[in-house]
Amino acid sequence: MSFSARMALCLAALAACSAPAVAEPLRAIYSIRGGGLQVMQVEAVFELDQPARYSIRAQWRTTGMARLFGGAEFSGGTEGRFVGGEARPTRYAVEGTWRGERRQTVLDYPGGQPVLRVRLPPDNDGREPVSEAMMRGTIDQFSAVAQLSRMIATNGRCDGQAGIYEGVRVVRMQARTAGRDRIFPWSTAWTGEATRCSFTCQQVAGFKADDDARVREPQEGTAWMASPRPGAPPIPVRVEVPSRLFGSLTVYLMEVDGVAANALASNAGSSDARSATGAPPAASRAP
């Protein structure tokens, strides 16, 4: 899986759903780190308060040494409806630059099925075309995690699956509940107890001719979900995915509504947590 695809996977993990009484957007800043350095920053706005509607918007850009592998700066998001507990996107749009080249994708969903309205560059970077049959029934990556998170908000579990298509490739994603963990403190990142969701993603369409066999292999990751502050909906507070360039990538929730995330954790500083000076393993199993 390419570096940009792994960034999308990280981003795919940065969304959640719940139903608090007051409909207020939740603004979050995430740091994505690999090899001990920040490689990307993400600013996200979650509007997940309505029982039947959702909207997720984000801006993300590569930082530091990651720019050596190709600078990227993007913005966009999705909006949609919940039908029977399932996310049904109505529009997905992302635009920005990758290695100095303009990129844009717009998907609409008439009749609930994805239709690619805009794709730049039009040659799709030399990838094989994705057939309508492979697109059928898919949703975008933000909506996929919104659906997963709605299940967590409803029953405390994250067991589910989805086909993800963002205009380039099709990925099958399956998630499963893996218990509860204590998130280790690091810098100003959120710390506390969270639900652990293990997930598997496997690309099944949209390959390049020169992709090696590893691109087709299942990729395992973990997302830890929790309410970042009292009264807020649960969102990803830490995420880990593998990376060929950096070994692994870790996503840290650093700020919520303009406040350092570690200052908002309702159970931060408890006897189960410990301090750290570097980027530690994400969590330890809760007793």
How should each PLM-predicted stretch be described?
Residues 1-9:
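Bacterial N-terminal signal peptides that target proteins for export
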Residues 24-111, 154-287:
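Acidic, serine/threonine-rich low-complexity disordered tracts
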Residues 112-179:
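A charged, solvent-exposed segment within the mature domains of Sec-exported extracytoplasmic proteins
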Residues 10-11, 21:
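Cleavable N-terminal signal peptides
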Residues 16-20:
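N-terminal signal peptide c-region/cleavage motif recognized by signal peptidases
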